[in-house]
Amino acid sequence: AMEGKVWLIKMTVDELVVYQNNHIISNVIPVGNRMEVRVVSDDKPAADAISTPPTLEDAYLYEFNSDWRTA
């Protein structure tokens, strides 16, 4: 089940560049001078991360990356 595995985090572009190296990013939406980033993660990835309902794309990315990590 994907509930509790998708998070919204607001961050700068510079933070996103570093963040995407270690996390599964499913979507990025510009909001002013920051980015609203959807992160797929088993654990809360940041103190200010907000849990959000998963989409089909989130589930696909989670499963694809899970298979890749265990290959």
What are these regions (language model features)?
Residues 1-39:
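ABC transporter nucleotide-binding domain
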Residues 31-71:
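C-terminal coupling/interaction segments
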